[in-house]
């Protein structure tokens, strides 16, 4: 007897298109998990050179959610930005917000309410990308 294989549903979102690699921007060498991350680093270096921010760092600090034993127990922001005002904020670059990513941001609000986390989503990325012809090192990671 032949038992037909059960059809499995194709995932609604695939990460096959994401390009990652080691890049050097502004003298800082790091592993960019996506071309978006590399491009946003180039954008922050542009802002630094223009005097709009003091500095930026890639994946500088892990925030731990004390007491959480299952699921998301920590959060590693993509960037730390030191602003001219003295404020330090963290930036997350996300083209697609999955459940795990949403949980991380919700837990950040709960466990670290004083920490500023800015999200660069598709819309914000597109706004920045419109200025990419001014930004040195934009497009370092390509297929």
What do these predicted ranges mean?
Residues 1-143:
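Electrostatic, structured charged patches in enzyme active sites and in nucleic-acid/phosphate-binding
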